[in-house]
Curated annotation (Swiss-Prot):
One of its GO terms (molecular function) is metal ion binding. Transmembrane segments: none annotated. Keywords: Metal-binding, mRNA processing, Nucleus, RNA-binding. This is Pre-mRNA cleavage factor Im 25 kDa subunit 1. A motif (Nudix box) lies at residues 101-122. Homodimer. Component of the cleavage factor Im (CFIm) complex. Forms a complex with cleavage and polyadenylation specificity factor (CPSF) subunits FIPS5. The record marks 55, 201 as: Interaction with RNA.
Length: 222
């Protein structure tokens, strides 16, 4: 019995060590220099120009047809000046977006995010892009009603929210091509600039530095 107990203890210690190593690996993010990526342009992407009332009408129509609207967005990180930078799409010099968009009915989060990354950042939106490693969901925001702003929690009195936005940490390979529509720019924005800068980047993107605070960054040299 003593030998069996010791063997079981050793097996448990080994399993715990493996789990701890897996956790450390999951919380360590390799960041590659911005200079190791290629940036190009493609045909302009049609963008809906709408006022708030038009957006509310569109949200109501979408909800009536498909129920809860779910959007997925990618947090892509690169290294510049030994500091993490987030890749953001800029439209008309004042509108910033994370790469991503709305899921199709029945589409999974990961499938939809990869499709949106191909649409926004690759030459051919109909061909899947290799290299992106979609990791964990680092944050969720909810729109309780059509006219309201989004919250990082679902109010307890809301049983049928109208929209959910999920942020995923997407790890990049050492090299990647980013081909962006001509009417957009792809900018590398430092975490220190995003931090609580809601006026410029909105309530979601300005919270990204806090969402990433549990991760450690390994600045890779090429």
């Amino acid at each position: 019995m003593g030998e069996e107990a010791r063997a079981l203890d050793m097996e448990e210690i080994s399993d715990n060590t493996t789990r701890r190593n897996d956790v450390v690996h999951d919380l360590m993010v390799d960041l590659y220099p911005l200079s190791s990526y290629y940036f190009g342009s493609k045909e302009a992407l049609r963008v809906k120009d709408e006022i708030i009332s038009d957006r509310v009408i569109r949200l109501k129509s979408n909800y009536a047809a498909h129920g809860l609207r779910t959007c997925v967005e990618a947090v892509l990180l690169v290294e510049l000046f030994k500091h993490p930078h987030v890749l953001l799409l800029q439209y008309r010099n004042s509108i910033f977006k994370l790469p991503g968009g709305r899921l199709r009915p029945g589409e999974s989060d990961i499938e939809g995010l990869k499709r949106k990354l191909a649409s926004k950042l690759s030459v051919n939106e109909n061909v899947g892009v290799s290299g992106y490693e979609v990791g964990e969901c680092i944050g969720m925001w909810w729109r309780p009603n059509f006219e309201t702003l989004m919250y990082p929690f679902l109010p307890p009195n809301i049983k049928h929210p109208k929209e959910c936005t999920k942020l995923f940490l997407v790890r990049l390979p050492v090299h990647q091509q980013f081909v962006v529509p001509k009417n957009f720019k792809l900018l590398a924005v430092p975490l220190c600039q995003l931090h609580e800068n809601e006026k410029t980047y909105g309530p979601i993107m300005s919270q990204i530095p806090k969402l990433l605070s549990k991760f450690s960054f390994n600045m890779m040299e090429i």
